């Protein structure tokens, strides 16, 4: 009986000791998980889409269908930039790109238009009064060759001057007198071929033929046989067809990239098989006040006259700048008041920096200043980081530093 009681007592004592030991070990276990989460002090909650609006408790954003994000006290720092939970940056697909140095390439097509070459333009006039004897079968739009007859006419003043010339020759007039009469005929517009014929034949001519002075297309011609013609009346207007002009309007912001004709590729929808040769180009000095564009004029060979004035054309401009600092265009934040990027420093902090933009093309932006080659900039997921920088005061510190450097 005593033995049984001793065994039971030993079991009870062992249970008490085990319970006490478990209690002691439980008290000594460090509450690591609890301190890692519960002890982080939350300053406020906010919606990244509206970072300036703060909330005192978690929940759904009243602006967007998303959970509010906590702002922790241990994230506050006087250092430049902000530090963001890597889980958040990964979930939002934050990506970075390296600032590089290289040429900014530009390639764009511009609508263009074919027109007459205004340097090849002739006006045929009657420099003395007379009347039209014959009009050759021509009209506006007809092509003529140099020397082709346009009309026959009689001009009394020319007939009278010829009579004076022949009279001087017969009466022994001096060379100076006869040459003076011939010069008067030239100034009155009598064709040189008719003057030579007068000298050779010594006979008065009463009918004269006005001819085309150049190859081209008639753009004005409205005369009929029997009509009187006054001094200085326009008989015809003729435009040359080789070369022609092709003009295009280009933005004034890319004028600095236009350097030589090798940058241009010209195509005409009406003749897609034709290879066009550009003789020379000119960037006209005037800027269109409404569109802020410059007129680019190309002089194009047109020996076969395949290019017709009024045709549509396309001008492809391919060019590149000198080496410059380049970043992806999506890395740029342009508020209208300032342009900035988010850089990543050696400690992994996101630091906003102001930049000066020079030009952008094909998804790449060239910078004047603000960054150095090799720096890292955020190219995707900018919104969260920029909002965080705004909340943490990093943007204000950036602006203060910029103002200090400016002074």
Swiss-Prot record:
InterPro entries: CusB-like_dom_1, CusB_D23, HMBD, MFP_Cation_Efflux, RND_pump_MFP. It comes from Escherichia coli O6:H1 (strain CFT073 / ATCC 700928 / UPEC). Residues 1-26 form the signal peptide. One of its GO terms (cellular component) is membrane. The cus efflux system is composed of CusA, CusB, CusC and CusF. This is Cation efflux system protein CusB. GO terms for molecular function: transition metal ion binding; transmembrane transporter activity. Induction: Transcriptionally regulated by CusR in response to copper and silver ions. Keywords: Copper, Copper transport, Ion transport, Signal, Transport. One of its GO terms (biological process) is response to toxic substance. Belongs to the membrane fusion protein (MFP) (TC 8.A.1) family. NCBIfam families: PRK09783.1, RND_mfp. Part of a cation efflux system that mediates resistance to copper and silver. The gene is cusB. The lineage of its organism: Bacteria, Pseudomonadati, Pseudomonadota, Gammaproteobacteria, Enterobacterales.
């Amino acid at each position: 009986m005593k033995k049984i009681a001793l065994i039971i007592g030993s079991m009870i004592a062992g249970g008490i000791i085990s319970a006490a030991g478990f209690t002691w070990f439980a008290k000594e276990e460090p509450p690591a998980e609890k301190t890692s989460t519960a002890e982080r002090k939350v300053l406020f909650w906010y919606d990244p889409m509206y970072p300036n609006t703060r909330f005192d408790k978690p929940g759904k954003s009243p602006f967007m269908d998303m959970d509010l994000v906590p702002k922790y006290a241990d994230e506050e720092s006087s250092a430049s930039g902000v530090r963001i939970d890597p889980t958040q940056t990964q979930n939002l697909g934050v990506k970075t790109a390296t600032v590089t140095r290289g040429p900014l390439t530009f390639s764009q097509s511009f609508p263009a238009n074919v027109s007459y070459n205004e340097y090849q333009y002739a006006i045929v006039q009657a420099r003395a009064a007379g009347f039209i004897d014959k009009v050759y079968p021509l009209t506006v739009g007809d092509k003529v060759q140099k020397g082709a007859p346009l009309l026959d006419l009689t001009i009394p003043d020319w007939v009278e001057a010829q009579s004076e010339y022949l009279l001087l020759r017969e009466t022994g007039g001096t060379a100076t007198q006869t040459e003076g009469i011939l010069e008067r005929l030239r100034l009155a517009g009598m064709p040189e071929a008719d003057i030579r014929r007068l000298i050779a034949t010594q006979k008065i001519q009463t009918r004269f033929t006005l001819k085309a002075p150049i190859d081209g297309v008639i753009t004005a011609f409205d005369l009929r046989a029997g009509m009187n013609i006054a001094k200085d009346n326009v008989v015809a207007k003729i435009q040359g067809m080789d070369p022609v002009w092709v003009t295009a309007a280009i933005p004034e912001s890319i004028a600095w990239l236009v350097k030589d004709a090798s940058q241009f590729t010209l195509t005409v929808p009406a003749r897609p098989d034709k290879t066009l040769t550009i003789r020379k180009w000119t960037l006209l000095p005037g800027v269109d006040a409404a569109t802020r564009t410059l007129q680019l004029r190309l002089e194009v060979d047109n020996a076969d006259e395949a290019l017709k004035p009024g045709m549509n054309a396309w001008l492809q401009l391919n060019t590149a700048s000198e080496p410059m600092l380049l970043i992806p265009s999506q890395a740029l934040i342009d508020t209208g008041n300032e342009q900035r990027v988010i850089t990543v420093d050696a400690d992994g902090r996101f630091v906003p920096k102001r930049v000066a933009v020079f030009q952008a093309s094909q998804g790449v932006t060239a910078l004047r200043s603000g960054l150095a080659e090799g720096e890292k900039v955020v190219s995707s997921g900018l919104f969260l980081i920029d909002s965080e920088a705004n909340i943490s005061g990093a943007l204000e510190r950036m602006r203060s530093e910029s103002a200090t450097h400016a002074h």
